[in-house]
């Protein structure tokens, strides 16, 4: 098994992950001098300060990639990423400690 792999009955057809959740697409640049890697469930609002982007709209969002995967930003690299909203109780704890509680709607 591959991390993030989903094995389903082929008779079900194609399954879209995170269907119906709010999504947000943005451009992100690594302005630092070292690579930065962001995991699938890391609160994007709280990622490394050397990733340059408008943070406010990313509050309550994570990368829209399979569980266990990550996106790597090389120094000087810009790339477009898609984010997906956290679901459930929408309580953010830990990470960089910038939120520590329920995300306001």
UniProtKB/Swiss-Prot annotation:
CDD domains: Urease_beta (cd00407). GO terms for cellular component: urease complex. InterPro entries: Urease_beta-like (IPR002019), Urease_betasu_sf (IPR036461), Urease_subunit (IPR050069). One of its GO terms (biological process) is urea catabolic process. Its EC number is 3.5.1.5. It is found in: Cytoplasm. Gene3D superfamilies: Urease, beta subunit. Keywords: Cytoplasm, Hydrolase. It catalyses: urea + 2 H2O + H(+) = hydrogencarbonate + 2 NH4(+). GO terms for molecular function: urease activity. It is an enzyme of class 3 (hydrolase). Pfam families: Urease_beta (PF00699). Its main location: cytoplasm. Pathway: Nitrogen metabolism; urea degradation; CO(2) and NH(3) from urea (urease route): step 1/1. The keyword Cytoplasm applies. Heterotrimer of UreA (gamma), UreB (beta) and UreC (alpha) subunits. Three heterotrimers associate to form the active enzyme. PANTHER family: UREASE (PTHR33569:SF1). Belongs to the urease beta subunit family. This is Urease subunit beta. It comes from Shewanella halifaxensis (strain HAW-EB4).
């Amino acid at each position: 098994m591959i991390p993030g792999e989903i094995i389903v009955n082929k008779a079900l057809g194609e399954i879209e992950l995170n269907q119906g959740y709010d999504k947000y697409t943005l451009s992100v640049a690594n302005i630092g001098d070292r690579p930065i890697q962001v995991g699938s469930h890391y609160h994007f609002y709280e990622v490394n300060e050397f990733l340059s982007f408008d943070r406010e709209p990313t509050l309550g969002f994570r990368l829209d990639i399979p569980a266990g995967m990550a996106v790597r930003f090389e120094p000087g690299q810009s790339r477009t990423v898609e984010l997906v909203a956290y679901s459930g109780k929408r309580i953010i704890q830990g990470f960089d400690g910038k939120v520590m509680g329920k995300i306001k709607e």
